Swiss-Prot record:
Cellular component per GO, a single term: Golgi membrane
GO biological process, one term: protein transport
Family of this protein: Belongs to the COPE family.
Any one GO molecular-function label of the UniProt entry: structural molecule activity
Main localization, broad class: cytoplasm
Protein name stated in the entry: Coatomer subunit epsilon-2
Record keywords: Cytoplasm, Cytoplasmic vesicle, ER-Golgi transport, Golgi apparatus, Membrane, Protein transport, Transport
SUPFAM superfamilies registered for this protein in UniProt: TPR-like (SSF48452)
Length: 297
């Protein structure tokens, strides 16, 4: 008689990470029993989830300090992500150069976490074609979900739908499939907005109310013209993380539609996330306005 399968101690950590419950991941790692016999691959996955969660809550230096030069490839990649996100221009260039060196190494270049980090960094650089080069071959649900995000950023919802169909064929009920479905629905608009709202509502009943889920629900409500209820969800999200980029950006948009001042949220966004797309767009608009004023003065 075959022995019972060993428990998957990382199952809950993965899903907490997917929905943005980063503190739950950090706490959950500590709760894994010391007697749990994790394989080397499982140990690397556990640590990558842990350190990616620390990055998500802004603890970049902790990640840089704790991951040594002899760490496994996935952890080296995660450390480079922390370096990229915490550094100035020099740090970013150094991180990208080292990532490219790892990607060019036939022995480790196909590692899924390495490719995921490369895709993340290049998305920050707005090099979407370059990001897709590393993520397009898929291999994990996270990589497929990133493909959907990249295609949507490239305004190729047709390609995003193709990637979504691949995810649905693999596991229609997977949380990342549901999230990707909601992202596509939000871009498609129309009747799809209600479907996206139902997805986020379902996720909010399964998981804690994270910034990711609250912002998803709020975006749906804003698309439906319900800015007051959207504002309530966004303020709840702001209470969870006062520096969350998407919460601040969505509060700017929501406040403007409610006829309220958005300057405080915009200033917070500029301070915490100066490279955010909304900040750059508004700065560009201000520059264009100033030039127009100078031209007619």
């Amino acid at each position: 008689m075959a022995g019972a399968a060993s428990p998957d101690h990382l199952f809950g950590l993965r899903y907490s990470f997917y929905v943005g419950a980063y503190q739950a991941v950090i706490t959950g790692v500590q709760a894994i029993p010391a007697r749990a016999a994790l394989s080397p691959d499982a140990l690397a996955e556990r640590d990558s989830l842990l350190y990616r969660s620390y990055i998500a809550i802004g603890s970049h230096q902790l990640v840089i300090d704790e991951i040594g030069p002899g760490a496994a490839t996935p952890l080296q990649a995660v450390r480079l992500l922390a370096v990229y996100l915490s550094g100035g221009a020099g740090g970013k260039e150094s991180a990208i150069r080292k990532l490219n060196e790892l990607l060019a190494d036939d022995a480790v270049g196909s590692n899924p976490i390495l490719r995921l980090v490369a895709g993340t960094v290049l998305m920050h650089e707005r090099d979407y074609a370059g990001a897709l080069k590393h993520t397009n071959s898929g291999g994990t649900m996270e990589l497929l979900a990133m493909n959907v995000q990249i295609c949507l950023q490239m305004h190729r919802s047709d390609h995003a739908e193709k990637q979504l169909r691949i995810m649905q064929q693999l596991d229609e009920d997977h949380t990342l499939t549901q999230l990707a479905n909601a992202w596509v629905d939000l871009v498609m608009g129309g009747s799809k907005i209600q479907e996206a709202h139902l997805i986020f509502q379902d996720l909010s009943e399964k998981y804690p109310a994270t910034c990711l889920i609250l912002n998803g629900k709020a975006l749906c409500l804003m698309h439906m013209g319900n800015f007051e209820d959207a504002e309530g969800l966004l303020l709840e999200s702001l209470n969870k993380d006062a520096k969350d980029a998407e919460t601040l950006a969505n509060l700017v948009v929501c406040s403007l539609n409610l006829g309220k001042s958005a300057s405080r949220y915009l200033n917070q966004l500029k301070l915490a996330h100066p490279d955010h797309m909304l900040v750059k767009r508004m700065s560009s608009a201000e520059d264009s306005f100033d030039r127009a004023c100078q031209a007619i003065s």
